Amino acid sequence: WSAGTKYGAPDNRTIIRFGEPFTLMSNRSADPANVQFSLPTMYHSHFWTAAFADLNYGKAAEAEQSGAFKAVTEAADKWVRMGVDGFRLDAVKHIYHNAYNDENPTFLKKFYDRMNESYKAAGGEGDFYMVGEMLDEADKAAPYYRGLPALFEFTFWYKLKWALQNGIGCYFVKDILDVQPLYAQYRSDYIEATKLSNHDEDRTGSDLGQSAEKMKVA
């Protein structure tokens, strides 16, 4: 910490409360463990598994009533009021514990609808854009179109990578077209957000053997 400060408090009765200022202690011997947080279990959800959710929104069907949902949307509203007309959502399958039941799509629809309302109230034209990163094959990602208008197309990249690595392109178009009816089951106006690799995967250049020709085709 600058000027030798660190988090600390005079004793363990000191509580940090939302919206109230807290002064950093300049004494290096101050014990950080003395600092308590008011209502620490309101937002955080502890599953204690290898993959657990970050925030406790309660039941997905009632998520909008939770303090966590209200805090997140209020923070997002500030960006909308400043002119932002879309969000990219990371790791949308990890909001609730089970990535493959209806909880995450249910939550995402509530979040999207709420932000779309804010966008229109701020004078936005058309609909708010929101794209989710659902890192999985098309059949697993498709149900997430119930909640979001756009999803990153991991299957597109998987099929394209295979075609370029093997020099076989005769299946590519069919493979991509075959997944579209699947998406349409969940959303008629779905948006396939085309991508190559991202930060969670080996990069495109590495997957394609640093071939400039293949990278240009991709």
Task: Label the model's feature ranges.
Residues W1-M25, E74-D77, D85-K195, S206, ...:
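Active-site-proximal helices and loops of the catalytic beta/alpha 8
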